[in-house]
């Protein structure tokens, strides 16, 4: 996501729990700040507020997303936007899929965000291609309440 955001951003921070992913991001030379760390711990301990928070292909590694949503909310300004993607599952809640990634139901996302975010938009999308198959999901855009 960073490449797409660089031209419209005055400051770009990236957070990833994987040192390897941060090393790859460094090679792009587009970030002003890169942090190796857990997203919840990093955002919860920071006083920095962001205009736009983007978490594409992040929640697929997180089952219970409430603490992530709360940490993101803490890092929002009053007019911030929070954009994220999930692999959608039909059953309520979330579960570990055969792919070893988490799927989340639309209802789960809406329930977990109800008290801290308002939905701006959501779209069903093709998230990524694996082999010959597209992985379908959903992208949400929220603003803080």
Which sequence ranges carry the predicted segments?
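A conserved beta-strand element that flanks and buttresses the S-adenosyl-L-methionine
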Residues: 54
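Conserved beta-strand signature within the Rossmann-like core of class I S-adenosyl-L-methionine
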Residues: 79-87
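Acceptor-substrate binding/catalytic loop of class I
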Residues: 92-108, 130
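Conserved S-adenosyl-L-methionine
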Residues: 118-128
